[in-house]
Amino acid sequence: MASDIGELQLTDNGISGIPVFQVSRYAVAALDAGKGRVQAELDFMPEYGEKELIEYIDKIKADMCNAGKSCEMIKKGNMPSLADILTGLVNKKLMNLFIKLSGGQTESLAGIIKHFKVTVINSKGIISAQVCRGGVRLDEVDTATMESKLCHGLYFCGEVLDVDGCCGGYNLQWAWSSGCVAGAMSLGL
């Protein structure tokens, strides 16, 4: 099990974004190991607890009810252009959905927002990978020189080793740093 927090992208063929990159190695490993169904549970509003989210939805509902009443009152007055502006700020279908939510439905909506489940069926493969897992095990390498412990004179660097870091340039830095060490050591510098 793994978790991360950050911006999530819903795409035409799945989910993406930094949190997906961060936890995908575990999901792909579970898929590769045939561990059965792999699920991701998405929390679209992690800054709220479930109770606070229900209260927030109820507040939005009340605000939209009031906005709807205000728009109707303005429409009956002499300011149709202002009514059009206010009505355009709140999508009518969304406003009607929130207004019609009963208490139980509000709790169900909050539950879906906090615990949205997605079944992971595959990754996009090596072609689309940001980082690769696997490679030469570190216990087979002298990490001070990047030389193989099994084959003298063979040096490794970057993703050929079983090292992958979190997003943010760490994998690139690992490739550069380990490459500098391996290159210098292979030349006897």
Where in this protein do the model-derived segments appear?
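N-terminal low-complexity, intrinsically disordered patches enriched in charged
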Residues: V23-Y26, T143-A144, S178, G188
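Predominant activation on well-ordered alpha-helical scaffold segments within soluble catalytic domains
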Residues: V20, A110, K114, W176-A184
